Curated annotation (Swiss-Prot):
It holds the Pfam family Rad51. This is DNA repair and recombination protein RadB. Keywords: ATP-binding, DNA damage, DNA recombination, DNA-binding, Nucleotide-binding. SMART domains: AAA. InterPro entries: AAA+_ATPase (IPR003593), DNA_recomb/repair_Rad51_C (IPR013632), DNA_repair_and_recomb_RadB (IPR011939), P-loop_NTPase (IPR027417), RecA_ATP-bd (IPR020588). Involved in DNA repair and in homologous recombination. May regulate the cleavage reactions of the branch-structured DNA. Has a very weak ATPase activity that is not stimulated by DNA. Binds DNA but does not promote DNA strands exchange. One of its GO terms (biological process) is DNA recombination.
Length: 234
């Protein structure tokens, strides 16, 4: 049971950028947020900014890096003088196979169950990098992906944690033979994600465009722009 006051702005994690305007304050706790887009569009930067902001408040972050791309130097840039204060608040997992990713998420759920009062954020960056390279048959892969998303949804809902997963894209042709950009993982990730944000690059103006594709209380199609800078995103 919760009182209504528990659903105010402290229920959201800010990004310190235009994305906060897009989401009316930031990424919501208690739900799964999917961020998808092409390489270099800002998915990991948003995730790291969220992680640093949570860690600065003395809360724990669980960060699952499936691409081996987490950069300590980037975290130092974002955190600035607060870096020494946050290093023990960000817990990193680095699975190298889809099955290992599966086991990591089971371990994380058990750990958060014991420490949920201390944890505000769980990041899976990215959800599908290992899914795309695994040798398992697609039917089994999809089944395992669904199980993983179920674990993340449980973490979000049961322990009031903001779950953020990043996702890649692919191109396909629609009925009119037009090239359409879609998120990898299809209906599986779409089903479990309560908030979905699509990122695009605008290299002409050195900006990124974020478009809201799904939200339970904000209209689809709302947009915001942001820039990637040394101290994070603005």
């Amino acid at each position: 049971m919760k009182v209504l006051a528990n659903f105010e702005d402290n229920h959201k994690i800010p990004t310190n950028s235009g994305i906060d305007n897009l989401l009316d304050g930031g990424v919501e706790k208690g739900t799964v947020t999917q961020i998808f887009g092409p390489p270099g569009s800002g998915k990991s930067n948003i995730s790291l900014v969220l992680a640093v902001n949570v860690a600065k408040q003395g809360k724990k972050v669980v960060y699952v890096d499936t691409e081996g791309g987490i950069s300590i130097n980037r975290i130092k840039q974002i955190a600035g003088e607060d870096f020494p204060k946050i290093v023990n608040n960000i817990i990193v997992f680095e699975p190298t196979s889809f099955l290992e990713q599966n086991e990591n998420l089971k371990t994380i759920e058990l750990w958060i169950r014991k420490h949920h009062d201390d944890v505000d954020l769980c990041v899976l960056d990215s959800a599908v990098a290992l899914y795309r390279v695994d040798d398992m048959k697609s039917s089994r892969l999809n089944k395992e992906l669904g199980k993983q998303m179920g674990i993340l949804a449980k973490i979000a809902r049961n322990y009031d944690v903001a779950v953020v997963l990043t996702n890649q894209i692919y191109s396909s042709f629609d009925d009119d033979n037009k090239d359409v950009v879609k998120a990898v993982g299809g209906t599986i990730l779409q089903y479990w994600s309560k908030t979905i944000i699509q990122l695009e690059r605008n290299d002409e103006f050195n900006k990124r465009v974020a478009t809201l594709k799904r939200h339970r209380s904000i209209g689809e199609g709302k947009q915001a722009t942001f820039k990637i800078v040394e101290r994070g995103i603005i």
